[in-house]
């Protein structure tokens, strides 16, 4: 049986989600799915195949998700550890625990103990005379779920997967921000150059922005009203004040109103709501939002027509889509809610909030554009980007066709190659999984900072699409990233034995825009480029034309295509007209047939006496031939026979009675 490793690919989107019941806010649920909007509808009973455990506490709201997994198996591992933190081996005390800023702490006395021990047991009820087995239950409060998520993101191996966060409610985002503010050593995420590396629990250096988080307060399905777009009375009912509330100083003897959640150092207020966090509108002055969708330039996928929103439909919550996930309305992505002018608050201004997209379209488009520029620089420096890319793909198409036949496999064109920027060994550019491009971060994948004071958005870092034209072997770039991590002064022995890196910078990139990137994003971009390359090769083989002819078709071809489309439309209209005429003709025939039958019936009624007299005259010859006439039935038969015989007689045979 062939190995599945050769056909492995990273899914465009797969996430673990955190559900919270609206009817009983203390009830939570953890799951995983490639389509969060559809999964929420299943849990709420709008679609079939929802979880049995969520059928009672409906309706449910999705608080946040953790996405960016490399496979379904990886997502299931994270889901199990998140749902059962008291049993997970990843959430146990290490011999030495490191804080976020890398400060070590000796915890050898608690080594092997759970960070989130069970605080309750199942009730010991009896069933059919037998005692029910008491089992430890995991801490399942909303605060415990959020704290367990933060602990997992800093634990190995999950800390090296480049996972990302998306928050769909104000409470989950604000609670996460309050926990970050309590961590010593963390600085504001305003400029990437001033950030310091974060560290895992075992002391491994992480990316300064890890984990990257975005907010979509319109909900995972777009049916939720963000608090920044509602009036002041609604915000007060939700527990959000207009200005910060001064806390009363409590005595030292009084215990703080926080939930005791195991030995994990972070804590949250016991009441898991915005009022318990003392939320105010200043807390939501700025928050990260997703990037708008990039224009789709893939020739193998048909672009959908954009629908213009009317003024009445614009304030409403916009539906999100997922082509494979069965969600509707992908054409609209920006939610602009016009707030009431009588609010008088600067935070009540209209703020465009981009919807969360559950795909890798932005990364794919940015990576393909960088690939085209690298091909033009390394393979066809004297030609334009389109011409160089067209010739490169034409060579790959010819090689693919020649490889299908054993007789022409050896006579195929040579593969386009380029030297590795680190080892100077030629790289076969037709094998997309053998090399990577410049690992500088794609600006289209970084979050935007939504601010209430400015109408424009700024990225979470100031880097732009400034990737260089370097090409590396995958193994060469991995070694370069590992060397950069080992050069860190705070790197521990556990990070020295790491096989794969977590982040790094381009070794050949020069200039001010040299930014670190996550290794998971480098591998994900490589798979997105590989999948698009394979689709495009098959598309060009079927069409029989080059890439340049598809992008810039000749005038004759364009007129032919337009003419064929016009002919198809004319044929369709003519066919529709003919069908309509046939329907009208059928209706007329039905009406005329009904009218003729009615007239015939009336005519038969008027001519009935004449017919009876003729029949009476024709009876005698039949009687002479020996036919018996018995009763009414015999008379009817004679009437029929005489009528048919009278119709069949010619004019010469009719007896003139005059």
UniProtKB/Swiss-Prot annotation:
Signal peptide segment: none
CDD domains given in the database record: GIY-YIG_SLX1
Top-rank lineage group of the source organism: Eukaryota
UniProt GO cellular component terms: Slx1-Slx4 complex
Cofactor: a divalent metal cation
Chain positions covered by the region annotation Disordered: 29-52, 239-269, 288-328, 594-658
Domain called GIY-YIG: residue spans: 12-92
Any one biological process term the GO annotation gives: double-strand break repair via homologous recombination
The entry's keywords: DNA damage, DNA recombination, DNA repair, Endonuclease, Hydrolase, Nuclease, Nucleus
Class of the enzyme per the UniProt entry, highest EC level: hydrolase
Primary residence: nucleus
EC number: 3.1.-.-
Localization annotation: Nucleus
Regions of compositional bias (Basic and acidic residues) in chain numbering: 308-324, 627-640
Residue spans of biased composition, Polar residues class: 641-652
One example GO MF annotation: crossover junction DNA endonuclease activity
Family in the record: Belongs to the SLX1 family.
Function: Catalytic subunit of the SLX1-SLX4 structure-specific endonuclease that resolves DNA secondary structures generated during DNA repair and recombination. Has endonuclease activity towards branched DNA substrates, introducing single-strand cuts in duplex DNA close to junctions with ss-DNA.
PANTHER family per the UniProt record, alphabetical: STRUCTURE-SPECIFIC ENDONUCLEASE SUBUNIT SLX1
Summary of subunit composition and partner proteins: Forms a heterodimer with SLX4.
Protein name: Structure-specific endonuclease subunit SLX1
């Amino acid at each position: 049986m062939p190995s599945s490793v050769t056909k492995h690919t990273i899914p465009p989107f797969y996430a673990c989600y955190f559900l919270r019941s609206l009817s009983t806010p203390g009830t939570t649920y953890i799951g995983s799915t490639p389509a969060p909007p559809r999964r929420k509808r299943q849990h709420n009973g709008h679609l079939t195949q929802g979880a049995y455990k969520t059928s009672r506490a409906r309706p449910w709201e999705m608080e946040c998700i953790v996405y960016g997994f490399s496979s379904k198996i990886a997502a299931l591992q994270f889901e199990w550890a998140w749902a059962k933190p008291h049993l997970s081996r990843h959430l146990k005390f290490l011999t030495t625990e490191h804080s976020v800023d890398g400060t070590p702490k000796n915890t050898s006395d608690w080594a092997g103990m759970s960070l989130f021990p069970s605080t309750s047991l199942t009730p010991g009820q009896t069933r059919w005379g037998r005692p029910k087995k008491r089992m430890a239950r995991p801490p399942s409060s909303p605060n415990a779920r959020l704290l367990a998520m933060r602990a997992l993101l800093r634990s190995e191996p999950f800390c090296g997967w480049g996972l990302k966060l998306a928050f769909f409610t104000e409470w989950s985002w604000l609670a996460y921000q309050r926990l970050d503010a309590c961590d010593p050593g963390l600085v504001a995420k305003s400029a990437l150059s001033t950030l310091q590396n974060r560290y895992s629990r075992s002391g491994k250096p992480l990316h300064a922005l890890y984990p990257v988080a975005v907010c979509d307060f319109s909900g995972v399905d777009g049916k939720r009203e963000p608090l920044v777009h509602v009036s002041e009375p609604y915000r007060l009912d939700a527990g959000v004040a207009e200005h910060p509330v001064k806390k009363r100083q409590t005595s030292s003897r009084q215990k703080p109103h926080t939930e005791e959640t195991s030995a994990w150092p972070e804590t949250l207020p016991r009441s898991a709501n915005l009022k318990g966090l003392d939320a105010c509108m200043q807390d939501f002055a700025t928050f990260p939002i997703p990037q708008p969708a990039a224009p789709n330039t893939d020739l193998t996928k048909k672009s959908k027509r954009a629908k213009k929103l009317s003024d009445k439909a614009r304030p409403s919550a916009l539906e999100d889509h997922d082509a494979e996930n069965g969600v509707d309305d992908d054409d609209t992505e920006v939610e602009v809610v016009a707030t009431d002018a009588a609010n008088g608050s600067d935070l009540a201004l209209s703020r465009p909030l981009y919807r969360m997209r559950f795909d890798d379209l932005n990364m794919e488009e940015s990576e393909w554009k960088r690939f085209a520029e690298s091909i033009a620089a390394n393979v066809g420096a004297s030609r334009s980007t389109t011409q160089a890319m067209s010739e490169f793909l034409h060579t790959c198409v010819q090689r693919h066709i020649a490889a299908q036949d054993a007789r022409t496999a050896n006579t195929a064109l040579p593969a386009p190659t380029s030297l590795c920027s680190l080892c100077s060994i030629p790289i076969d550019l037709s094998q997309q999984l053998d090399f990577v491009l410049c690992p500088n971060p794609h600006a289209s994948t970084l979050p935007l900072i939504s601010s209430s004071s400015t109408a424009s958005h700024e990225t979470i870092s100031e880097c732009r699409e400034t990737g260089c034209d370097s090409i590396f072997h995958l193994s060469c770039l991995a070694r370069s990233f590992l060397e950069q991590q080992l050069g860190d002064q705070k790197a521990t022995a556990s990070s020295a034995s790491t096989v794969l890196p977590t982040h790094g910078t381009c070794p050949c990139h020069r200039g001010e825009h040299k930014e670190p990137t996550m290794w998971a994003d480098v591998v994900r971009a490589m798979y997105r480029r590989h999948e698009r390359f394979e689709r495009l090769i098959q598309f060009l083989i079927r069409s029989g034309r080059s890439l340049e002819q598809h992008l810039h078709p000749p005038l004759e071809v364009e007129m032919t295509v337009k003419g064929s489309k016009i002919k198809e439309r004319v044929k369709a209209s003519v066919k529709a007209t003919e069908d309509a005429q046939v329907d009208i003709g059928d209706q007329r025939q039905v009406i005329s047939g009904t009218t003729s039958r009615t007239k015939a019936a009336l005519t038969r009624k008027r001519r009935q006496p004449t017919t009876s007299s003729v029949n009476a005259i024709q009876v005698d010859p039949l009687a002479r031939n020996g036919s018996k006439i018995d009763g009414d039935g015999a008379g009817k038969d004679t009437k029929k026979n005489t009528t048919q015989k009278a119709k069949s007689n010619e004019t010469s045979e009719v007896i003139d009675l005059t």
